C-alpha cells in the first residue's frame, strides 16, 4: 500500500518539535489548559552561547551549557503528566536526539558566520589541521622549507642512441694526398685500420717489383676510385678530411662494384 503524504499538522506532532515546549517549566501549564500549542523549534541563537568562535583554532571553543539542554535535564527529573494530545515520557533517546540536533545547529551557525555555507565538514577540518595554536602553520615555515626543490630531468638525446650518420655519395672522388698513389693508399688503410691492410701491402710490394706493375697499378687505381664512396662524411676542406684520418674512423666501401673489384684484385692469379 502506498502511504500518502502526511499533512503539516501530523508532522508538527513529532518528538523533535515537542522538546522545546515539553521540557520547560514555564510551558507545562499550557499542556493542561490549552489543546492547541505552537510546536516549533527554538531559534539557533538560543541554542548556542554567544561566545565567539576563533576560526584559526584547531578545535572549536567549548560552549557553555545552553538553556535548551538544561530544560531537558530538569524535565527528565520530574514526571510530566500528559495532557491533551501530547504525551510526556522519559527516555534516554530524547537527550541523544536533542544533542545531535544541537551539534548540527551549531555547525550550521558556524558556517553561516564564517561564510562557508557551501563547504563540507571535511574541508573545514583540513583547514583547522593546518593551524597550530590559533595561528596558521604557514607563518612559522622558514624560507628553506618553502623553497621548492626542482626535479632533475634526465637529458636524453633525440634518438636515445647515437646511430651512424648516413651520407649521400658525392662526385668529389679526390682524397688528397692519396689520389693515384699506391703507397699513400697503403698508408691510408694502415692508419685507419682496415682489414685489407695486409693484403694491400703484399700486393703493392709485389706489383712494384714485378715487370707487369703497370697492369696492377691500373687495377689498384680503379679499385681506389671505387672505394671513395665511404661512410666518412664528405668534408668541404682538406683539414676536416685530415682530422678524420687522424681520428682513425673505420671506413668501409659502400658500393658492390668496389668490393667485387677488391676481391678480384686480391684473389687473381698473376702470371
UniProtKB/Swiss-Prot annotation:
GO terms for cellular component: cytoplasm; nucleus. Its main location: cytoplasm. The keyword Nucleus applies. InterPro entries: TF_Nrm1/Whi5. Keywords: Cytoplasm, Nucleus, Repressor, Transcription, Transcription regulation. It is found in: Cytoplasm; Nucleus. The keyword Ribonucleoprotein does not apply. Signal peptide: none annotated. Transmembrane segments: none annotated. It comes from the Eukaryota. Belongs to the WHI5/NRM1 family. Negative regulatory component of the MBF complex involved in cell-cycle-dependent transcription. Component of the MBF complex. This is Transcription factor NRM1. It comes from Vanderwaltozyma polyspora (strain ATCC 22028 / DSM 70294 / BCRC 21397 / CBS 2163 / NBRC 10782 / NRRL Y-8283 / UCD 57-17).
Amino acid at each position: 500500500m502506498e502511504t500518502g503524504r502526511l499533512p503539516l499538522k501530523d508532522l508538527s506532532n513529532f518528538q523533535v518539535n515537542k522538546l522545546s515546549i515539553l521540557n520547560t517549566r514555564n510551558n507545562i501549564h499550557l499542556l493542561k489548559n490549552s489543546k492547541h500549542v505552537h510546536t516549533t523549534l527554538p531559534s539557533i541563537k538560543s541554542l548556542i552561547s554567544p561566545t565567539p568562535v576563533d576560526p584559526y583554532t584547531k578545535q572549536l571553543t567549548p560552549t557553555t551549557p545552553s538553556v535548551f539542554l538544561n530544560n531537558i535535564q530538569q524535565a527528565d527529573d520530574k514526571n510530566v503528566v500528559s495532557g491533551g494530545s501530547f504525551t510526556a515520557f522519559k527516555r534516554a533517546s530524547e537527550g541523544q536526539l536533542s544533542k545531535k540536533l544541537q551539534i548540527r545547529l551549531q555547525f550550521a551557525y558556524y558556517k553561516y558566520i564564517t561564510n562557508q555555507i557551501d563547504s563540507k565538514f571535511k574541508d573545514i577540518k583540513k583547514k583547522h589541521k593546518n593551524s597550530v595554536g590559533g595561528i596558521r602553520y604557514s607563518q612559522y615555515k622558514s624560507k628553506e622549507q618553502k623553497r621548492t626543490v626542482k626535479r632533475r630531468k634526465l637529458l636524453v638525446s633525440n634518438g636515445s642512441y647515437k646511430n651512424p650518420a648516413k651520407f649521400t655519395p658525392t662526385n668529389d672522388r679526390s682524397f688528397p694526398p692519396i689520389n693515384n698513389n699506391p703507397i699513400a693508399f697503403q698508408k691510408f688503410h694502415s692508419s685507419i685500420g682496415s682489414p685489407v691492410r695486409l693484403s694491400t701491402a703484399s700486393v703493392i710490394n709485389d706489383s712494384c717489383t714485378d715487370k707487369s706493375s703497370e697492369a696492377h697499378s691500373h687495377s689498384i687505381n680503379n679499385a681506389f676510385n671505387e672505394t671513395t664512396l665511404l661512410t666518412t662524411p664528405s668534408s668541404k676542406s682538406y683539414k676536416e678530411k685530415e682530422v678524420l684520418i687522424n681520428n682513425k674512423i673505420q671506413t668501409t666501401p659502400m658500393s658492390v662494384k668496389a668490393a667485387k673489384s677488391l676481391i678480384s684484385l686480391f684473389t687473381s692469379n698473376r702470371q
